[in-house]
UniProtKB/Swiss-Prot annotation:
It comes from the Bacteria. The gene is lacA. Heteromultimeric protein consisting of LacA and LacB. Its EC number is 5.3.1.26. PANTHER family: GALACTOSE-6-PHOSPHATE ISOMERASE SUBUNIT LACA, RIBOSE-5-PHOSPHATE ISOMERASE B. It catalyses: aldehydo-D-galactose 6-phosphate = keto-D-tagatose 6-phosphate. This is Galactose-6-phosphate isomerase subunit LacA. The keyword Isomerase applies. It comes from Staphylococcus aureus (strain NCTC 8325 / PS 47). Gene3D superfamilies: Sugar-phosphate isomerase, RpiB/LacA/LacB. InterPro entries: LacA, RpiB_LacA_LacB, RpiB_LacA_LacB_sf. Transmembrane segments: none annotated. It is an enzyme of class 5 (isomerase).
């Protein structure tokens, strides 16, 4: 499992905080926007492509408010994503929605909160069962 991360210019600093946190915790991290100045649309598409390339990969995209990247991610066939700004949502979107991507806003979420959101997201496990009905409904929409 790899954690694929990316950001636009507004999210670059927070992306580096998250990347350091993940690397410190021994996660395999791929930064698809390292050394690049990209729009949130391109950052999100690059993260989603790598997430979908291998089962088990997860993605994190940071822009100014999280909403733009979220809208892009949800347009991608087969991608379930969540815009999150609290720890519980980061964890629960894995457990109940089987989200493979989260988006966050660097102007909404501070460093410590971002690390806690990411911790919940990457440590969360999909519960399946009754939640699979909704996941199937989401996938059928694509």
């Amino acid at each position: 499992m790899a954690i694929i991360i990316g950001s636009d210019e507004a999210g670059k600093r927070l992306k580096e905080v998250i990347k350091s946190y993940l690397l410190d915790n021994k996660y395999d991290v791929v930064d698809v926007t390292e050394g690049q100045e990209v729009d949130f649309v391109d950052a999100t598409l690059a993260v989603a492509k790598d997430v979908q390339s291998q089962e088990g990969n997860l993605g994190i995209v940071i822009d100014a408010f999280g909403a733009g990247s979220f809208m892009v991610a949800t347009k991608i066939k087969g991608m379930i994503a969540a815009e999150v700004s609290d720890e519980r949502s980061g964890y629960m979107t894995r457990g109940h929605n089987n989200s493979r991507m989260i988006t966050m806003g660097s102007e909404i979420v501070g460093d410590t909160l971002a690390k806690n959101v990411v911790k919940g997201f990457v440590e969360g496990k999909y519960d399946g069962g009754r939640h699979q009905i909704r996941v199937d409904m989401l996938n059928k929409m694509c």
